[in-house]
Amino acid sequence: MTTIERITTPRIRIFDTTLRDGEQSPGCSMSPPQKLVMARALDELGVDIIETGFPASSQSDRDAMALIGRELRRPSLSLAVLSRCLQADIETSARALEAAANPRLHVFLSTSPLHREHKLRMTREQVLESVRKHVSLARSYIDDVEFSAEDATRTELDYLIEVSRAAISAGATTINLPDTVGFTTPEEIREMFQQVIAGVADVPNAANVIFSAHCHNDLGLAVANSLAAIEGGARQVECTVNGIGERAGNCSLEEIAMVLKVRQAFYEQDSSINTPRIVGTSQLLQRLVGMPVQRNKAIVGANAFAHESGIHQHGMLRHRGTYEIMRPEDVGWEDSQMVLGRHSGRAAVEARLRALGFWLEEDELKLVFEQFKGLCEQQRVVTDADLQTLMQGGSNAQGYRLASMTISDVGSRANALVELSDPDGNRVAETAQGDGPVDALFGALSAATGVQLMLDSYHVHSVGIGADARGEANLSVRHEGVEYDGTGTSKDIIEASALAWLDVANRLLRQRQANAASTTEAPAPATA
């Protein structure tokens, strides 16, 4: 699809940065194989651009780009990487993009007076010269170049126009005006886009340039500001699944996509998002990074389509439109949960796993199906929660796995004995005492794995149907000052708690392995 075709189509381009900006959220880092799994889901979701990472920062991001580029070849999908306005960064990014069928090189530089003085220590003219030089360099490698004016919403309007003109003249095909610190308001950002677009109109090829919004959620306005930017002329929105990202996060992909769908008559724009895949994609990300969304999260929260008020329930029974502006099935929720059993075949199990966001290779599917049939011998039905439990057990295959545990009372205290299989298949056993079974359990797990976690919050609840219901444990912990979330599911809530603890511990161990494999010192995180 050409640039001219893109700009004349009444459609908003969805630039997903879950794998780059979203991953910068504390505790949300992903390994290259995990990024590939997430990228597959984003491809099925129908995003237009996937930003895979920041190649100059680590070998891990370069490996992820190579994996994703080799597999995802959809003609309408672009793969992007981020680069500072530095020659070495741009050259590294260009090499990383060699695997992509449709590459985009995304370069950024701060433009606000605060950043120019304290971060860059550069004058206005020096920033302009750097933009000209490095956008031109990027364009010499890649035809599709995006330039981001970091902290655009705190940049002088006349200077922002000047920088945008310079970037377009140097060959930029997309101009991104980020609200880097979530400072602006809808009225301000709408006016900013209108003024900048008008201010570059006479630059050659400006009519073919896409203007993009990248809004952070520090004041809770990321989605509202992105919509206002669309009203001001933006035709690309940069966002993340579940709104994850630095500090308070980014514009939420699922929210922006559903606003454009539900209120299409107002905005006269739509997106290419395959909306019935939204919930599955959201749940996949929650599992990969261990960060559940709050129950009242729009679109993907567990309560998004729940009605408890008697008045609301009565209205819903009369007509769904009384209290629902969209159907649950339009975003991937189901009115009734699909139930599998002993007579279900492998194709049905595979289809349900894909709907839940799990894409398995043939050998992986064979193993999970064998586990599924074993579960069918123990209970009448297998629900979505049961399938997620099976997949969670498989996710620990390369880390510590729970072999057995024993909890007993020792006077006023509890004693826990745990036996684990370590990543090499060896058995490790440790005991610990604590002020209750969970405290003792976590102490024993810490001793067995060598991982120290500080518990912030912990709760359990039931998932599943009737007598086959299982307990799900959710915990939030800290490790070296960074927050992590873990989830575990089992018939026994203490075992579920152990699985939740190991969920975090195994993720930390995988991160250590990925960091050890990296051969390049990481620069400061990008925030554009």
From Swiss-Prot:
It catalyses: 3-methyl-2-oxobutanoate + acetyl-CoA + H2O = (2S)-2-isopropylmalate + CoA + H(+). The keyword Manganese applies. PROSITE patterns: AIPM_HOMOCIT_SYNTH_1, AIPM_HOMOCIT_SYNTH_2, PYR_CT. GO terms for molecular function: 2-isopropylmalate synthase activity; acetyl-CoA C-acetyltransferase activity; manganese ion binding. It is found in: Cytoplasm. Keywords: Amino-acid biosynthesis, Branched-chain amino acid biosynthesis, Cytoplasm, Leucine biosynthesis, Manganese, Metal-binding, Transferase. Its EC number is 2.3.3.13. GO terms for cellular component: cytosol. GO terms for biological process: L-leucine biosynthetic process. Residues 401-528 are annotated as: Regulatory domain. Mn(2+) binds at D21, H214, H216, N250. It comes from the Bacteria. Its main location: cytoplasm. Pathway: Amino-acid biosynthesis; L-leucine biosynthesis; L-leucine from 3-methyl-2-oxobutanoate: step 1/4. Residues 12-279 form the Pyruvate carboxyltransferase domain. The keyword GTP-binding does not apply. Belongs to the alpha-IPM synthase/homocitrate synthase family. LeuA type 1 subfamily. PANTHER family: 2-ISOPROPYLMALATE SYNTHASE 1, CHLOROPLASTIC-RELATED (PTHR10277:SF9), HOMOCITRATE SYNTHASE-RELATED (PTHR10277). Catalyzes the condensation of the acetyl group of acetyl-CoA with 3-methyl-2-oxobutanoate (2-ketoisovalerate) to form 3-carboxy-3-hydroxy-4-methylpentanoate (2-isopropylmalate). NCBIfam families: leuA_bact, PRK00915.1-3. Homodimer. This is 2-isopropylmalate synthase. It comes from Stenotrophomonas maltophilia (strain R551-3). The lineage of its organism: Bacteria, Pseudomonadati, Pseudomonadota, Gammaproteobacteria, Lysobacterales.
